[in-house]
Amino acid sequence: MLKTSTYEDLTIYKMGRSIGKFVPYFVHCFLLEDTLIDTGTGFAGSEFLSALQGKKVNRIVNTHYHEDHTGNNYMLQQKHAARIFAHRDSIPNIENPRNVKLKLYQKWIWGYPEGSATEAIGDHLYIGSHPFRVIPCDGHSAGHICLYEPHKKWLFTGDMFCGIRNIYLRRDEDFNQILLSLEDLSKLKIDTIFCSLKGVVTGGGNALSEKIKYMKNLKKEILSLHRQGMPADKVRNKLLGKEDMMFYVTGGHFSKQYLINNVLASPYSKSTVE
């Protein structure tokens, strides 16, 4: 399934794999001038290609290598001769996606992308008249970048934002590194966030501040309860509840307990959150 909308100069593509009428997970891609930011899932590839008819796609920027962000790279590179850019640490897995062993749910929802030739992105780029800073952000994946347009105060966050209140952590994520990256991003003047999961988030600076506040408070509560002698599984039950469908559907890849354990194991957690 694919839906198209616009926001100022942007065309936004919301897509996901259709299982009958059910779409288990949507992602967003953003076209500005001739540049596409992320390419979504290959399961929506034919619809995406049709939606892009009559548009120029000379360049693709991948925020990171995950399969729901690179799924149509190869097809668009073949169709439009688009050059693809990403952080150097993402390039090996974009060019050779089977370097990464996908979980069963990932294969079902997104599938393996085809490999695509990719170039290292610099610190800055222009998309038409729009200047962008390229900002590396740790915590979600190796080689993740965000894109910031200072005149419009736009921030393209890939998977660094994904809503204010998150109660799960992927087993390849780092809670404290995500928090540090978000704190760095919060120093920017932000009007609008463009999020792979949530789409357009107006009042983006406030939303980012709320997310940081939530994460810091959650971390503080986790550490406080643990220092009082509460076992980690009891901390989870009190603050986040027991594991639910997300845990079982993803085979434990998304986990409340892993969030708790990750906070407790981090060297950053040896000091009190201000």
Where do the PLM segments sit?
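Active-site HxH/HxHxD metal-binding segment of metal-dependent hydrolases
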Residues: 46-126, 213
